[in-house]
Amino acid sequence: FIEIKNEFHKRMGYITYDMDGKKTCLDLWVECLNNIEPINQYPEYTDLLSRLELNQNGQFLLLRYGQYSDIYNGEIDNSGEELWSIYDGFYRECRSIVIDIVNDKIVLCPFAKFFNINELEETSLENIQSRIGNAKTVEFSNKLDGSMQSATWYNGQIIMAGSQSINPNTSWRLQDGYKMIYQLPGYERMLREYPNITFIFEYISLKDTHVVKYTKEQEGLYLIGMRSNLTGEEYSYESILKFAKLYNIPTTEIFNKTLDDVMTELDDKSSDEA
C-alpha cells in the first residue's frame, strides 16, 4: 500500500484520498499510474489488486481477498491454494484488515486466513498431528457459528469492521455490532484500555443464522481472539478468557481434549449444539 501511495505521489506530485463511486483511492492511484504514457507500466499493481475486494470509509480502507468464484472465473471448485502462496502469502493477511490510509497505520488486524483440516496440504491431518507433536502449547476452542467482527480503540473512538464492511451505515450486521458494543460497558472499557489491540468477535444473531441454531439469549459479540496491531502477535485462548472474565463479556470455551477426541466428537454434533 505504502509503495503504491508513494509512487503515485512521486509521479503525480500530489496525493488524494478521494473515491469515485465504488472505486477506492487505492484503485484510483493504480488506474492513474497505469494511464501514464507509456500506459500499463505497473502490471504488478493491477495484478495485486485483482484478487482483492476493497472497501473505503473516509480515511479507513478495508482489504479482503476476493471470493474464489470471482478470482477463478466462476470455478468455485478450485481450492485457491495458489492464492495463499503468491506474494509471500500476502493474501492470507487480507482477511478484512483495515488501514488508516492517511497516516499509514494498521487499525484492525483480524485473524490471518486459516483452513480446515485436509483443505490444503499444509493442514492435512498428518501435518497437523506432526505440528501438535512439536508444539509447546495446543488449545482447542469451541468454534462459534456466526460472523466475524473486529474492534479497536483508535484516535479517541471505537472502530469496527465486519468481513466486508467498515461503514455501519451500509451494513446492518456492523450496525448491530456497534449496538452490542455499547450495551455492555465492559466492551468500551476494554477497548479504551488496550488501544493497540484488535479484539476479534463472533457476532451471533438470530437475524444472521448459519448452520448452528442459537437462542435469543445467546445473541451477542463473543470474544474469540486478540491480536497486536503493532507486531501481529496473536494472544492465547487462555489470555482471551482472562480478558473476557475481567471485563465481563461473553467468550468462547476451551476444552481439555486431544485431536482424536475432537475428530470423533464431530460426527456426533447436531445443528443446535453451539
Predicted regions and their residues:
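Core nucleotide-handling region used for phosphoryl-transfer chemistry
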Residues: 1-274
